[in-house]
Curated annotation (Swiss-Prot):
<dbReference type="GO" id="GO:0006612">
    <property type="term" value="P:protein targeting to membrane"/>
</dbReference>
<comment type="function">
    <text>Palmitoyltransferase that targets several endosomal SNAREs. Palmitoylates the SNAREs SNC1, SNC2, SYN8 and TLG1, at cysteine residues close to the cytoplasmic end of their transmembrane domain. May have a role in the cellular quality control of transmembrane domain-containing proteins.</text>
</comment>
<dbReference type="GO" id="GO:0042144">
    <property type="term" value="P:vacuole fusion, non-autophagic"/>
</dbReference>
<dbReference type="GO" id="GO:0016409">
    <property type="term" value="F:palmitoyltransferase activity"/>
</dbReference>
<keyword id="KW-0472">Membrane</keyword>
<dbReference type="GO" id="GO:0019706">
    <property type="term" value="F:protein-cysteine S-palmitoyltransferase activity"/>
</dbReference>
<feature type="topological domain" description="Lumenal">
    <location>
        <begin position="1"/>
        <end position="2"/>
    </location>
</feature>
<dbReference type="GO" id="GO:0042175">
    <property type="term" value="C:nuclear outer membrane-endoplasmic reticulum membrane network"/>
</dbReference>
<keyword id="KW-0449">Lipoprotein</keyword>
<protein>
    <recommendedName>
        <fullName>Palmitoyltransferase SWF1</fullName>
        <ecNumber>2.3.1.225</ecNumber>
    </recommendedName>
</protein>
<keyword id="KW-0256">Endoplasmic reticulum</keyword>
<dbReference type="InterPro" id="IPR039859">
    <property type="entry name" value="PFA4/ZDH16/20/ERF2-like"/>
</dbReference>
<feature type="topological domain" description="Lumenal">
    <location>
        <begin position="201"/>
        <end position="216"/>
    </location>
</feature>
<dbReference type="GO" id="GO:0005783">
    <property type="term" value="C:endoplasmic reticulum"/>
</dbReference>
<keyword id="KW-0812">Transmembrane</keyword>
<feature type="domain" description="DHHC">
    <location>
        <begin position="134"/>
        <end position="184"/>
    </location>
</feature>
<feature type="transmembrane region" description="Helical">
    <location>
        <begin position="51"/>
        <end position="71"/>
    </location>
</feature>
């Protein structure tokens, strides 16, 4: 099979993935949606072996880079490397991503069953994103603050960040350290390889094989990808939130920008509400006949509230994040 044919098939597959949800009632997209898209990309519980494909893909890429170096590159640049570099530094750089990747895969984040109510590790409810006495509809256990149910792992993960497809594991309380070390080790190994190969290529007096250029480009690309992803992860930590909470905060701030987020000044009501203005159909004067209803920011509370004393939030600084310790280091220490 030629590379051109393989490329065409790959593009066709991507097009089917993108269009099948839109044209799921039209053949041939309907067949693809029913037999491929739905069971493989939507249903978490069907064909669970698919969850190992991305970690296998990552492992294959990494092993290909190592193979290319040892079998096609090392012999051509051997004289350009220091002895200590060949026998110690290179092996040390190659091994950590593999070892830490395995460690991140097998390290289990804590869940609600590990949580003891009233313990010193318990996070308080902020009555904005999290409310007490809310039971997970699947686990049937009261959800601690900052927890989230993972449909793939089928459990409520404490301080849940996200389910990482690269290691097929939930990132949460108990394995943040392993996850961050895995990311940093990938950046360091790829960056070192890229810079060293680039330096050798620029200063070499002889023509180097194409494999050196290929490995240099691949390591450079993976350095950028890993660095961007790691930066985005750590930027969230700086703000005192998780990936899961970032989505919640975005929703809260969208309501604020629309002038629909209010804080109650009544002692007998939860603090935060969404304001919904409804126009009466038979109103003669629209501005004077608007009906205002308030809904709690608690997604599990569907009651209508009538507030008499409240203020409309106009700036993000008026919304406290009680989980933000103030500095990046303090937030990172709290997670790990």
């Amino acid at each position: 099979m030629s590379w051109n044919l393989l490329f065409v098939l790959l593009i066709g597959f991507v097009v089917l993935i993108l269009l099948s949800p839109v044209f799921k009632s039209t053949w041939p997209f309907s067949t693809f949606y029913r037999n491929v898209f739905q069971p493989f990309l939507v249903d978490d519980q069907k064909y669970r072996w698919k969850l190992h494909l991305v970690p296998l893909f990552y492992t294959s890429i990494y092993l290909y880079l190592v193979y290319t170096y040892h079998m096609r590159v090392e012999s051509t640049i051997k004289n350009e490397l220091f002895l200590l570099e060949r026998i110690l530094i290179v092996p040390i750089i190659i091994l950590p991503p593999v070892a830490l990747g395995i460690l991140a895969m097998v390290s289990r984040a804590e869940d609600s069953k590990d949580h003891k109510s009233g313990s010193t590790e318990e996070y308080p409810y902020d009555y904005l994103l999290y409310y007490p006495a809310i039971k997970c509809s699947t686990c049937r256990i009261v959800k601690p603050a900052r927890s989230k149910h993972c449909s793939i792992c089928n459990r409520c993960v404490l301080v849940a960040d996200h389910h990482c497809i690269w290691i097929n594991n939930c990132i949460g309380k108990g394995n943040y350290l392993q996850f961050y070390l895995f990311l940093i080790s990938n950046i360091f190994s790829m960056c070192y390889a890229f810079l060293r190969l680039w330096y050798i290529s620029l200063n070499s007096t002889s023509t180097l094989p194409r494999a050196v250029l290929t490995l240099t480009i691949l390591c450079g690309c993976f350095t950028i990808i890993c660095a961007i992803f790691t930066y985005l992860q750590l930027a969230i930590v700086k703000e005192g939130m998780t990936t899961n909470e970032q989505d919640k905060w975005y929703t809260i701030q969208e309501y604020m920008r629309e002038g629909k987020l209010v804080r109650s000044l009544d002692d007998d009501c939860p603090s935060w509400f969404f304001k919904c203005t409804e126009q009466k159909d038979d109103a003669a004067e629209p501005l004077q006949d608007q009906h205002v209803t308030f809904y709690s920011t608690n997604a599990y509370d569907h009651k209508h509230y009538n507030l008499t004393h409240y203020i409309t939030i106009k700036d993000a600084s008026e919304i406290p994040n009680i989980y933000d310790k103030g500095t990046f280091l303090a937030n990172l220490t709290d997670l790990i």
